[in-house]
Amino acid sequence: METLLLEIGTEEIPAGYIGPALDSMSATLLKKMTDARIEHGRARVFATPRRLAVEVKKVANKQTPLTSEILGPPEKVGFDKAGKPTVAAKKFAEKVGVSVNALKVKDTDKGRYVCAKVKERGLPTRTLLKRILPEVILGTPFPKTMKWAELDIEFARPIHTILALLGDKVIPFSLGDTKSGRYAFGHYFMHPKKVKISHPKDYIKILRSVKVLVDLAERRKRVEKEVEKASKKAGGAVLPDDELVDIVKNLVEYPIATAGKFDKNFLDVPREVLITAMREHQKYFAVIDKKGKLMPCFIAMNNTRTRDMNLVAT
């Protein structure tokens, strides 16, 4: 049993596309593997704005063998009056790959027919995945797709890398002008170079080391901690907003929060208007004081750390 890992490295995908795309990718991949008689465990998904990934553990190295019964010519055509196989029976046996002596006669609704039991040996899983993975990628639905570089393929955003591993082996295939391999990009600003992934088990750890938190739960938790830390530093507390946390986590690869201020005269504007403006238009978190009143500041989430964070938001 091996672990399968597929990562599609892209330009920045809209935050709202990511969740549905991951659901589709994982469901489609598991169905295609089941249909191909590849035993497998559960799927786990990963993502950032610049990548969509799915991991499947306990993947068999070969297809499950399949035994099927194939009907041939009618008995009277396949065997002569003495019960010996005719040319028709011999050709049927040759066609399905069995010995003439292995042929049987079966009663059917249409009469008695020559039949053969044929056992299909399982193909290597890597061979099957060379066909399956491109189908999964191109079959991923998005509200809008785009073409690029005059290629006859579409995706949410241009594809730059494809990481495809079964255990420590690459699953080789091409999609447009991109070949699969064992490389993924680090953080766009803090580590823009490619990194080598030797095995799926190293994926999360290696990307974390290049400032990419690909685990959705880990990145969400960091967003919450960063927002809480920044709001405390500003002298207040963040206005709870789980939905905004989910949105923001898909806007960044390595969340770093900063507090900004606005003119306190804007607090004369109805609370709901201020919150909506910050939340919907800027994806900012509102900050409240101990009495629950809005403070003239907000928390913004950055995708990189600067030398002087005070210059980022004022």
Where are these regions (language model features)?
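Function-dense linear segments that define catalytic or interfacial modules
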Residues: 279, 286-314
